[in-house]
């Protein structure tokens, strides 16, 4: 799945993001609003990980998203 599809249907994918990253709040996910870089930043911030690790996690999420 490509990010444009996720971005266009963010409300649908928010639940999957919440399952993958249980520490993210509803406010975090609303702030992301389908923006990939914002999601990377929020994951990095909440989990205290390096940007490249957060990027890898988001890429994994992108690859495994289900419509």
Q: Which residue ranges define each predicted feature?
A:
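Intrinsically disordered, low-complexity, hydrophilic segments
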Residues: 1-67
